[in-house]
């Protein structure tokens, strides 16, 4: 009888330990997923022969309100309509070095949360980080290289 009680106790303790361990792992996984969240597209940048002419064409034919940097599309966040967001559209001169080391004629900017933690996670996963995080009044930026050699810009917008 003592052996059966001991076996039941060991099995129960093992089950509860496994359950507790699984709960801890699941919570850590949720934090990792939260850390890696891309919240949207922050910008689309592309090379062209004449950025000024390109801006004028889009202004004339598609109604873009352009500046020397292209245009900025404003929108509201679905989860919190009180919060504004924006997506930048910018033509660059075909001679720009800004997209290097990528040889592509475009670069996409992704809006992210918690950039510092995301960069650490990406480093641990072996992703190439091109530069250090830079901070400006409108947010923090860093560049990475994806699996096909495309330079990607990650942007954590400044808190409003």
Task: Report the location of each language-model feature.
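Bacterial Sec-dependent N-terminal signal peptides
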Residues: 1-29
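Residue-level signal for short segments within beta-strands and strand-turn junctions
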Residues: 77, 93, 156-158
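Vicinal oxygen chelate
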Residues: 20-49, 68-70, 96-160
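A generic local structural motif
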Residues: 30-32, 93-96
